[in-house]
């Protein structure tokens, strides 16, 4: 397959390099990724400023690679619309940290994959829960699961309007219990605002968020922290079809 690989952690992030090394053994890979760290960019795109696209050399990789000064969604657009590589699949990741629950709405990783489906290209988002503060993460288990899901999906289930959102738990590989296909949960946080500086220009704060207790069983949040790999099909259409007819009756009287 002709695969576009992107992320939101930046073109030199170890997760994207580990993924590209393995995927490129069996597929034609093009990397288009942000020049810098762009986590939590959500689905933003660059419309008020120009973007810089630069071909890059990444040691150990024998595939085309480009850095983009914009957002993860910009990167997907560049890969699909500007480079014209006839992409058949978009893979976004491997993200350092999980993208589960309603956190997916903030995620540049997931949004880069969703951008692919908006343009009719099947997409997979891959993220791995990590021990924060640790810089030498081993992404090999996440790579194995990504390839396993890719191999199954390309034979059984790759749909042009669906993102497969894959998350790997922070468990030793031998202790992972298997894979659960499940719904997203609801992520809420207790946010603390910490004053850093105060002057005539205003008050400068940093934030610290602590996740509230997970209440929804059978969700991606629940299963991930029980030691399961989670897989959730996502769609860019936010329409609530369950109540669409009821709302129509009320407002189209």
From Swiss-Prot:
Signal peptide: none
Enzyme Commission no: 3.1.3.5
Cellular component per GO, a single term: cytoplasm
Cofactor binding, note field: Binds 1 divalent metal cation per subunit.
Cell compartment(s), UniProt: Cytoplasm
Keyword RNA-binding tagged: no
Residues annotated as transmembrane: none
Main location: cytoplasm
Keywords: Cytoplasm, Hydrolase, Metal-binding, Nucleotide-binding
Record field: catalytic activity: a ribonucleoside 5'-phosphate + H2O = a ribonucleoside + phosphate
Molecular function terms from GO: 3'-nucleotidase activity; 5'-nucleotidase activity; exopolyphosphatase activity; metal ion binding; nucleotide binding
Annotated residues for binding of a divalent metal cation: 8-9, 39, 95
Entry keyword Lipid biosynthesis: no
Cofactor(s) for this UniProt protein: a divalent metal cation
Protein origin, superkingdom: Bacteria
Family: Belongs to the SurE nucleotidase family.
Function field: Nucleotidase that shows phosphatase activity on nucleoside 5'-monophosphates.
Identification of the protein by name: 5'-nucleotidase SurE
Organism encoding this protein: Clostridium beijerinckii (strain ATCC 51743 / NCIMB 8052) (Clostridium acetobutylicum)
